[in-house]
Amino acid sequence: MQWIEIIRLRTQPDVEPSVIKWLKDLIHGLGGTPGLDEARVYTHSAVPGDVSLHMMWDTMQEIFTESEVGLMVAEALKKYGILDHTVWLMKGKNGHRQVTG
């Protein structure tokens, strides 16, 4: 089953660059993690200090909860601000679309 794990941090704007660097370094090291298809780092378009990590998983399991990687990331980030850690199950999609430009 495909699912997504989202870790969202609301921190001070001056802390955001170091958090982004840490997350980017982290996701480059996640290659080969069983079940992890992709990991992406996002920032809010209008709110400085809002950062999120999206990890897309494809695993065979019956109970969906935070991953070990996600729990480690959340533990490391919680000292920087307000943290939200959620798991979402995919229930539908409209195919693969590539955007260029």
What is each of the regions a protein language model found here?
Residues 19-22, 34, 53-56, 66-68, ...:
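Surface-exposed beta-strand edges and their flanking turn/coil or helix-capping segments
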Residues 4-9, 40-67:
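Short, well-ordered beta-strand segments in beta-rich or mixed alpha/beta enzyme
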Residues 1, 37-49, 74-101:
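Glycine-rich beta-strand-turn "strand-cap" elements at beta-sheet edges
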Residues 3-6, 15-21, 50-53, 95:
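Generic detector of short, locally flexible boundary/turn motifs and exposed helical patches
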Residues 12-14, 58-60, 92-97:
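Short coil/turn motifs at secondary-structure junctions
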Residues 13-38, 68-77:
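Short amphipathic alpha-helical segments
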